[in-house]
């Protein structure tokens, strides 16, 4: 495979995360669900530094065309980041869903994906909002590859009310509410901010 595609991109993304999270364990996870098989995409899990810390899950391969598929029309691509409060394969399922929809129609900052059920058991959040990766250090937001730039997008679980608020007042207004309340998006039992 050529530079910036397939395995080369996955290797670069993994190295990018290992550099950004030195000393933390990065685990490669593939996926195969009943409804979705994408062997060119996997999830990288960054384990927390300390017990009780947050788990970071990052897609790897969504930013490049599928093998045998049409070539990329753009010189930029996106990978998606989901934060969970504990180790769970549900994060892999959710990222598979996001990557699938991204493959159908490119997801941009401000777009939402309906999960159709709580993102984690007991949560009132059943939608995922694509946002800028505010939790990551600035140098981790983008990875330059030969002929392609990979942008990392945060996937934030939100409620139906928060989704409606963003549609009505805009993403910036919703993100302002997140900031005002000190949103802990990874908390499955959090209340709606609106």
Q: Each predicted region: which residue ranges?
A:
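Acidic, proline/glycine-rich low-complexity IDRs
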Residues: 1-194
């Amino acid at each position: 495979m050529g530079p910036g595609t397939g395995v080369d991109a996955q290797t670069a993304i993994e190295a990018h995360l290992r550099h950004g999270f030195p000393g933390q364990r990065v685990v490669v996870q593939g996926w195969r669900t009943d409804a979705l098989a994408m062997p060119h995409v996997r999830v990288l899990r960054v384990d927390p530094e300390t017990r009780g810390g947050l788990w970071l899950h990052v897609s790897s391969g969504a930013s490049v065309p599928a093998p045998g598929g049409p070539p990329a029309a753009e010189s930029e691509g996106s990978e998606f980041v989901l934060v969970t409060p504990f180790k769970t394969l549900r994060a892999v399922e959710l990222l598979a869903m996001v990557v699938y929809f991204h493959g159908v129609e490119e997801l941009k900052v401000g777009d939402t994906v309906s999960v159709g059920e709580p993102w984690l058991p007991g949560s009132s959040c059943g939608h995922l909002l694509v946002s800028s990766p505010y939790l990551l250090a600035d140098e981790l937001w983008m990875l330059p590859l030969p002929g392609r730039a990979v942008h990392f997008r945060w996937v934030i679980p939100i409620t139906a009310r928060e989704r409606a608020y963003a549609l009505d007042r805009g993403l910036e207004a919703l993100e302002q509410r997140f900031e005002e309340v000190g949103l802990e998006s990874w908390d499955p039992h959090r209340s709606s901010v609106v």
